[in-house]
Amino acid sequence: MLDIIILILLLMGTLLGLKRGFILQFIRLTSFILSIAFAALFYKNVAPHLHWIPAPDFSAGQPALSFFTGNLEAAYYNAIAFIVLFIIAKILLRIIGSFLSIVAGIPVIKQINQMLGAVLGFLEVYLFTFVLLYVASVLPVDALQQMMGQSSLANVIINHTPYLSGLLQELWTQYGA
């Protein structure tokens, strides 16, 4: 079931990128990557201030989070800090990007603009899905963990995305370990 949802999301991203075109999609993808970079740089500064948020019980009775070897509570707060910073940066960059998107209205090489936009649309949704699945993998919710455990596509995205799979695991398990 999760595999079908992921495939639909990836198809929608591709079609949206096709509709938006390369220029607008490039602005959106760049803002997405910059938001991830911003969150990755500053989440360690924010995570220690989030302990007022109650952490779930990460006791042995919870579903196994097999690829995390570090402190799950630290990973939980790191994930929250990362997501909050990501959302803030994404909103600010989207506002800036909306001013730059005026360039996308110039009718220059429309088909190339659309095809390259489709590729970037796919990449944007893939990266978003990757981050969403990674955050979901930290949450000790039985139904969610079971759904993710049955999804071969989620497993491939989480564990085999070049560079990002190892990076997020390393980043999120460092603090407090």
Swiss-Prot record:
GO cellular component terms given for this protein: plasma membrane
Chief location of this protein within or outside the cell: membrane
GO terms classed as biological process: toxin biosynthetic process
Record field: transmembrane: 4-24, 33-53, 80-100, 115-135
Topology relative to the membrane: Multi-pass membrane protein
Top-level taxon: Bacteria
Gene name in the database record: yshB
Classification of source organism: Bacteria, Bacillati, Bacillota, Bacilli, Bacillales
Pfam families, A to Z: Colicin_V (PF02674)
InterPro entries, alphabetized: Colicin-V_CvpA
Keyword Calcium: no
Subcellular location: Cell membrane
Name this protein carries in UniProt: Uncharacterized transmembrane protein YshB
